[in-house]
Amino acid sequence: MTMQTITAVSGNDDAATHGAAAPPGGALLSLDGITVTFPGVRALDAVSLSVRAGEVHGLMGENGAGKSTLLKVLSGVNQPQAGTLTLNGTVQRFASTRAALEAGIAIIYQELHLVPELTVAENLMLGQLPSRLGVVDERALAVRALDALERLGEHIDPDIPVKYLSIGQRQMIEIGKALMRDARVIAFDEPTSSLSARETTQLFRIIRSLRAEGRAIIYVTHRMEEVDALCDRVTVFRDGRRIETFESVAELDRDQLIGCMVGRSIEDVYGYRPRAAGDVMIEAKGLTGPGLSEPVSFAARRGEIVGFFGLVGAGRSELMKLLYGATRPSGGHVELGGKRVAFSSPRHAVRAGIALCPEDRKQEGIVAIASVADNLNISARRHFSPARVLLDARRERDLAQRYIERLAIKTPDGDTPIGALSGGNQQKVVLARWLAERIDVFLMDEPTRGIDVGARAEIYNLFYELAEAGRTVILVSSDLAEVIGVSDRIIVMKEGRIAGEVAKAQATPDALIKLALPR
């Protein structure tokens, strides 16, 4: 089966706007009354949905809303107990992923389904390798692979193993696989979660090209800005049901969208709770180091949530690492509770009462293959086993269970690998780890990135509880609504220095952006 041509889209092309999209055609894919049940759970409850040819249809909802189950129905992984799936006018029922692919439906999952040891060309043609007399036709394979890569706009050697490619390049190979099978419906599951800004731009160009060809695109995301940039319509799921389909993204009311997702208003999501601040808990005096262009000075009090806002490269994450002892300052110092401190490592910072929830949660915050209990106990373990020879399994199990219940961490049990949890529940485990350490200062670097709205509300409530208990929370966030909605005051950084501070009452998007923009 040959791959159809993908129309090239330049960075300045008008197709980047909604108005330039190809007019949507009739429904290419229709779901009517789809119901999927598991023991004790109704994952999809009589869901009806249509996706048109030539549109990008966004799917939004909290984790557990039913989006992933819907994709599994489309791909043949799950078979519904009721309802019908109609593709291009024909009722279909897929008994396997192969059947769905052959019918023309492809899913691009977050966890890419490539074989790392095989070459780019072999992955592109997986399951349909060209052969002659029972032997792979290497020449035909190379020609088809080069053709596919050229049409995707990717300059990749087709003979190198996929394991050497970036995440963005691997994702392009997945898209190429779908097009090699001439998929007319392509679903993307949180595709930008691990991509750089450049890779995201390239992905959007490809998706717009696919839309212009008349393919039906399903786009699952938590990110409002991606819906604005890419989608024609958006459907919201909650608790296994389709709540509403918004017919025009250009006229979308964000507050209404969030309300549909979580079942409450946007004010309830942030739920700001004012409180009195106490004495200064942490203070930086003339701090300099990697990522800072000028000496940085600021103070944060007990019971206070201090927001740090800035654009990419402003120096916020670098400042947090200096406070945490992950990097060494070249000048200035830090005071904790009025006493001068100097940390040679994060371990020393933790023992003094400072903890960091890092920006890259998956790489720096958790051990993905370890259990929830092991991740939670990583730091507290030294209290249970001073000699560091024998582990106290019972105490560790009890501690894990206590915090699983206290923070309402959604996991079957403490032995579940943390990598199997949603982003919001992974972040709760990281927070629980530090709660078990009696931390005074919580450095939260982009704590809700990639987390759905409902889980965000739960994490914000944890911040308020910490502040009400006299702890200090420093919130680094690129989300304007979040940093304004949660913080007591906001410090804005720009080009490695503090550009200004904004009080709660004066905090508006315009005020923060004006301070954050480069000269």
Curated annotation (Swiss-Prot):
Q: What top-tier enzyme class does this entry carry? A: translocase
* Signal peptide range: none
MF term (GO), any: ATP hydrolysis activity
Indicate which residues the UniProt annotation says bind ATP.
61-68
- Disulfide bond sites: none
Question: What reaction does this enzyme carry out catalytically?
Answer: L-arabinose(out) + ATP + H2O = L-arabinose(in) + ADP + phosphate + H(+)
What Gene Ontology cellular component terms go with this record?
plasma membrane
**Gene3D superfamilies given for it?**
P-loop containing nucleotide triphosphate hydrolases
The ABC transporter domain covers which part of the protein? 29-264, 264-515
The record's annotation in PROSITE patterns points to: ABC_TRANSPORTER_1, ABC_TRANSPORTER_2, ARAG
Q: Which family does it belong to?
A: Belongs to the ABC transporter superfamily. Arabinose importer (TC 3.A.1.2.2) family.
Function (record text)? Part of the ABC transporter complex AraFGH involved in arabinose import. Responsible for energy coupling to the transport system.
Under the subunit heading, UniProt states:
The complex is composed of two ATP-binding proteins (AraG), two transmembrane proteins (AraH) and a solute-binding protein (AraF).
Protein's name according to its UniProt entry: Arabinose import ATP-binding protein AraG 2
Whichever gene encodes this chain, its name is araG2
